[in-house]
Structure formats: C-alpha cells, structure tokens
Amino acid sequence: MTTIVKRALVAAGMVLAIGGAAQANEGGVSLHKQDWSWKGIFGRYDQPQLQRGFQVFHEVCSTCHGMKRVAYRNLSALGFSEDGIKELAAEKEFPAGPDDNGDMFTRPGTPADHIPSPFANDKAAAAANGGAAPPDLSLLAKARPGGPNYIYSLLEGYASDSPGEPAEWWVKQQQEKGLEVAFNEAKYFNDYFPGHAISMPPPLMDDLITYEDGTAATKDQMAQDVVAYLNWAAEPELDARKSLGLKVLLFLGVLTAMLLALKLAIWRDVKH
C-alpha cells in the first residue's frame, strides 16, 4: 500500500511539473494569482464587490457576451432590490408569441428571464467579431484552467491597445528559435490566451465606468470585480456550501467528543 501511495504521489508531481512547463513554454509568463475573498474554508464572497462586478459586466462585457445560465432574479443574491431587478430585465427585449394573428413579437424582459446574448445566434456573433463568437460567460470561471486567476490574467495580459503588436518577450523568443516574427495584424496579442492572438480588444481601461458606490474604477479594480462576479455566476452556492460544511464539521466534532465521553464513562470501572 505504501508503495502504491508513493507511486501515486510521484505521478501527481510529474503531471504538475509537466503542466507547469507546458504553460511556461506556451505563455512565457505565469498567471497572476490573486488573493480572492472566497478562497479558503472561511472565505466568502464580498457582496459590494459582486455588485461592482455585475456593473462591469452589464456596462462593458454584455455588449458581446451573454450569461444564459444566470436569471435576472438570481441577482437578488447580490443585494439588488426587486424593483432594481425588474428594471434591469426590462432593458432587454425577448421573443414572444405568436399573437392571435400568428405573428411573433417581442416583450420586455422579466426577472424570470436569463441574461441573453446580444446576438441573435452564434453565426451572427461570429460575423460581428472577426469569425469567433464570444463565449457565454456563465461558467467561464469553472471551464478554464486556472479559473479566476486565468480570467484576471487575460484581462491584464494585453501587450498593446492596438492590434498587430506582439509582446517583446514573444518577439525575442521567436528570434531565438530562428522563427519568423510574424503576428496577425487584425489580432491583439495577449500573454495568456492560447496562441496569443485574440480577437477581443482590451475591454478595460481606467475610468471606463463610474462605480455607483464611489470606488475608483481603475483597470485593475474592474478586472478583479468582474472576475469575482463571474466566479459567483459559476458557483453561486459557494457560500452556502461552505457554511454547511462548517456546520457538519462542528457537528461531527461535538458528536466525537460525546462518543468519547460516553466510552470513558462506560469503561471507567472496568478493569483491564
């Protein structure tokens, strides 16, 4: 059994080492690891940060991305009022019908509706974005290796605000390998995107929006806030799950102590 465990640990170490090396070879840089508020057994989401993150998504990201797995009514968990949620939902039009004449029509959104894509379909989305349809963001924080750290790094990883301008480290790397230094003039260079050529322009810049709570809207602040919101969208039950886990651990601890005390009481007068 000991030998099996040792072999498993060695294999796991090799996998991690290979994975790290592959990431370094492809990206040239490591992910920016952030101290997220929800990490650790006692970590929890920061509700004001989630509200700011939704504001970034709503005012910036939603022009290209949808969140089909998040209903407007779910935003009540972020502290939004019922009236505020109704107002947000009503900003969007949803297909409905047919009417009495058999014609389809549109209606204002309701809290039961899910946050839609701004495009009618994937082909329309791809046509409007250089051939690549922007992904739905509902589960992005769980779907990408590195999760929130990857998304944050991606948002911060643009080499230039202009397309066709690769990072200096990449140019040097190509030259050292004797390869042609050629980069797609229509793409933006990103340290963390696979292949480094991304169609999405840098989405964030300082003071792009005005936070409703008065927080300074720096690029870094907006990146952290929207990543927090995306992680909540992917794991909205995280706080409840951790609270339940702590209660279970507390219960098991008390139960163990009671059983131990009971055992000692039963066997106290028994001679061994």
Swiss-Prot record:
GO molecular function: electron transfer activity; heme binding; metal ion binding
Compartmental location: Cell membrane
GO (cellular component) term, any one: plasma membrane
Binding residue positions for heme c: 61, 64-65, 200
Post-translational modification: Binds 1 heme c group covalently per subunit.
Pfam families: Cytochrom_C1
Transmembrane annotation, as ranges: 244-261
Principal subcellular localisation of the protein: membrane
Record keywords, A-Z: Cell membrane, Electron transport, Heme, Iron, Membrane, Metal-binding, Respiratory chain, Signal, Transmembrane, Transmembrane helix, Transport
Protein name: Cytochrome c1
Native source organism of the sequence: Rhodospirillum rubrum
Gene: petC
